[in-house]
């Protein structure tokens, strides 16, 4: 069975940034407020399914979305500009590939790949003289997991997630370099009530926040960082 999908996406963005410290070089002391803006894009996708074996493969494309942000800048050592030029921003296009298939009775294997074109995202307020606040590598994420229905009431899943790292020298505004994660979750149903809980452990890749300038060097050393997240949801059907 083959199906297609499409739709309009609305995206709202606002931001504020303050740069302080030697890692920013001459830009230390700079600050900017970006007022909210709503932009519109689209998504297109297609899916192929074989329900008898719980097979589903889907590909979805998300378009770029353009924004124009009213901007107030200040520093270093200067008064705020109440009516600075607007800052253009384009958020990245992306592609998702998702799949699942039955491998045994009440057991699924699932996974996905996501790519986002973050290397094309540039935020260039006027006072920075054409320099971008962002310098992000393209984003690649791989997910692979197994889900199983243990009874009519309880099902569970475990999955691994990998995000590719890039250059060890990273922006101080995003001081990670790839990551690896493990997620375990389960769902328990009681008549019309569905209880879902999960826990995630993520290990971040080592990175070196860099100084500003034409020849950046490491200004710090971030190693052995991790995070734990816990989620819980209650659903009621009627």
Predicted regions: what they are:
Residues 1-238:
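Outer-membrane beta-barrel porins/channels
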